[in-house]
């Protein structure tokens, strides 16, 4: 998919946080603990959740699914087809994180990549983003897998 190691680590740090996972443990079958709306390692919600379930079904799967390959495939599909977006709540992160997908793919800073992914793909409210935890997970992933 052409992502730098730093951008990939930023994605992993976000997925670790979103799925309630810990190092070496991204939970593919995670369900949001508050209201059950978000599902999967990305915590797809609302319309995105409906589309994700349709994607699973079109590939012979149903929810819950532990098929990490399908979840990654769908996440990358979303990123390439309109879900890499700067919306109102993204602005709290700061304008410097409003990067194109191509710029993100080439990112060389783990912390920047983590914040950019959170702002443009996860799109959680800044005050609830837990960026310290996301960034710690991303830095852990980068240190563990760098140049492997």
Describe the function of each predicted region.
Residues 1-61, 119-148:
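Cell-wall polysaccharide-cleaving catalytic domain and substrate-binding groove, primarily
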Residues 12-15, 72, 76, 114, ...:
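Non-transmembrane alpha-helical segments in soluble domains
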Residues 19-109:
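Peptidoglycan-targeting cell-wall enzymes and recognition modules
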């Amino acid at each position: 998919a052409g992502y730098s190691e730093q951008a990939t680590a930023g994605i992993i740090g976000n997925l670790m946080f979103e799925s309630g996972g810990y190092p070496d443990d991204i939970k593919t079958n995670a369900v949001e603990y508050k209201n059950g709306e978000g599902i999967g390692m990305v915590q797809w919600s609302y319309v995105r959740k409906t589309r994700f379930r349709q994607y699973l079904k079109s590939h012979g799967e149903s929810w819950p699914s532990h098929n990490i390959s399908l979840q990654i495939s769908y996440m990358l599909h979303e990123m390439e087809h309109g879900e890499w977006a700067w919306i109102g709540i993204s602005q709290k992160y700061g304008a410097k994180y409003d990067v194109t997908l191509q710029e993100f793919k080439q990112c060389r800073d783990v912390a920047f990549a983590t914040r950019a992914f959170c702002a443009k793909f996860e799109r959680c409210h800044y005050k609830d983003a837990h960026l310290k935890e996301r960034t710690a997970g991303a830095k852990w992933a980068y240190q563990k897998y760098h140049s492997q």
